[in-house]
Amino acid sequence: CGSSKSNDDELVVYFVPSRDPKEIQSATAPLADMLKEELAKEGFEFKNIRIEVGTSFEAVGEALESGTAHVGFIPGGTYVLYENGADVALTATRLGLNHDSDNPADWNKAPTENTEKQVAYYRSLVIAGPSEKGQALAKKINNGEKLTADDVKNVTWGLSSNTTSPAGYIYPSLWLQENFGLSLTDLPNKVALDNYATALTQLA
């Protein structure tokens, strides 16, 4: 929840653009009426509840900090950067996956599917694309070989343009540093990914 600077007649709820904003707006359209009804039961009556999708993860954090957003669904990385202007109201869980290994080859043995187990974390996956270089890395991994710093420097990386995105930016940064002693600035070839939903399309 963001700053207390608000019009009591309206509640503004923001989502980060983790996928196509139009898809998020369509999926969350019923949320306004649901919130209005449930909040009224708790004594919070709003004339209008507005659902918005930010232009970036950071834009949602800034909206919370400035008070133009009253509630935001944000990842932990965004919260860390904007915690002075926001308080945690709820934390979410999600369905886990049937693969939960630190060995990347394990993920390639069978399709990844949801399980019924609720988890409070999620993983970031480094996906090798269909290009010759991408498939060479995938073959090396599936053969049980370890990648080298030269391996990862000699390919083009797709990274989230949202620098507070855990899966798209923060976790890959940590992985590169811990495994190869590299930072993102050490990668000579990088392209910005729009969001999670279009990332694989861009990779292809």
How should each PLM-predicted stretch be described?
Residues T28, A32, K36, G61, ...:
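Extracytoplasmic/secreted envelope proteins and their assembly/folding machinery
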Residues R94-S165:
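A conserved helix-loop-strand patch within extracytoplasmic ligand-binding domains
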